[in-house]
């Protein structure tokens, strides 16, 4: 999640277009973004969750995103308080070294000598190619990838605790799972507020607090525009009240990404139950893998994701220039 690197996450920036070719990134660009993925050859089981439009679009009320095309290649830029950067590689048929070089030329024009110029969410094959071309890279936290079948079943001793929590929800609470509908908007917002209060009552570090402050804005955008950017949602109800929700998207026909998940923390095991049901539904629809994204450098989230025994933590690199 790129926002964790910003000094003030909730800054509302004045949109300043520094190049006439730049256009504001909206949901209308979703088809264009998707078309650009194929010739870029970046989608595979090891692809990062960032190579989907929803991953970026939900944050555009907090951080202006801009796009442009050059040599039939799609460039996506984010305008942070510190300057301009790219949240993912240029997408298109142009040679990677050429398009990345062009991207850094533009960012250096806009940012001057500032080290903020960078390209995030670069995968291992592209990183190796760019290093051969003289580009410098540094590693950042990667996405957690799981076998969908394993998370749907939660079989064996390795998943004993998660399975017990799911069983407790089934035994003690009458929870129903339903697809998200537009009429669920208000109930999900109410839950989001309650969840944020519960989280603040726990042990959050300063970064966790900052991420939480921006969550409501991003989640509210999802509730309203989910279908415009390829998201599907699920809600859990108890006695008619929404007590959990989750949204995700298909990164590839074999990989389902869990974009966000919120569960009432007063119901023990509810988060684990919802995650299992999400994985079951994805597996039924053909998913071989579940991408649960990164851990945002939060120790608690890292421990929770490792407890599900990922098959891989996908390499994720930042290109810093030559």
Language model: regions and residue ranges:
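Active-site/acyl-donor-binding loops of N-acyltransferases
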Residues: 2-17, 136-155, 289-322
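Aromatic (often tryptophan-rich) hydrophobic motifs at membrane interfaces
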Residues: 230-322
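Acyltransferase donor/substrate-recognition loop-hinge adjacent to the catalytic core
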Residues: 6, 132-209
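Short, conserved active-site entrance elements at the starts or edges of catalytic domains
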Residues: 190-241
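Conserved donor-binding loop and adjoining core beta-sheet/short helix segment
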Residues: 48-118, 122, 237-265
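Short, polar loop motifs at secondary-structure junctions
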Residues: 120-127, 162-165, 296-297
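Short catalytic-loop micro-motif centered on adjacent basic/acidic residues
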Residues: 116-118, 178, 288-292
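Amide-forming acyltransferase catalytic core, primarily the GNAT-like/NAT-type
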Residues: 2-73, 77-78
């Amino acid at each position: 999640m790129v926002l964790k690197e910003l000094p003030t996450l909730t800054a509302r920036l004045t949109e300043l277009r520094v190049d006439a070719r730049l256009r504001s990134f909206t949901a209308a660009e979703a088809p264009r973004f998707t078309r650009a993925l194929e010739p870029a050859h970046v989608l595979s089981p090891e692809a990062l969750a960032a190579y989907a439009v929803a991953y970026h679009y939900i944050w555009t009320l907090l951080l202006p995103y801009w796009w442009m095309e050059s040599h039939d290649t799609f460039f996506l830029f984010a305008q942070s308080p510190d300057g301009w950067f790219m949240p993912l590689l240029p997408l298109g048929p142009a040679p990677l070294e050429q398009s990345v070089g062009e991207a850094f030329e533009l960012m250096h024009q806009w940012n001057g000598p500032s080290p903020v110029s960078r390209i995030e969410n670069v995968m291992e094959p592209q990183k190796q190619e760019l290093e051969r071309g003289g580009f410098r890279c540094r590693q950042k936290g990667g996405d957690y990838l799981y076998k969908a079948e394993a998370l749907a079943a939660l079989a064996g001793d390795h998943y004993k605790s998660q399975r017990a929590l799911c069983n407790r929800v089934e035994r003690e609470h009458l929870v129903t799972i339903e697809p998200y509908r537009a009429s669920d908007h208000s109930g999900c917002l109410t839950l989001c507020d309650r969840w944020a209060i519960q989280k603040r009552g726990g042990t959050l570090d300063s970064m966790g607090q900052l991420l939480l402050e921006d969550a409501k804005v991003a989640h509210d955008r999802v509730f309203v525009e989910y279908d415009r950017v390829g998201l599907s949602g699920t809600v859990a109800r108890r006695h008619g009240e929404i007590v959990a929700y989750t949204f995700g998207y298909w990164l590839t026909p074999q990989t389902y990404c869990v974009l966000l998940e919120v569960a009432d923390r007063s119901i023990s095991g509810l988060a684990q139950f919802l995650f299992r049901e999400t994985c079951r539904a994805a597996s039924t629809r053909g998913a071989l893998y579940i991408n649960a994204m990164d851990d945002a450098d939060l120790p608690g989230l890292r421990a929770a994701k490792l407890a599900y025994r990922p098959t891989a933590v996908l390499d994720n690199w930042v290109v810093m220039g030559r």
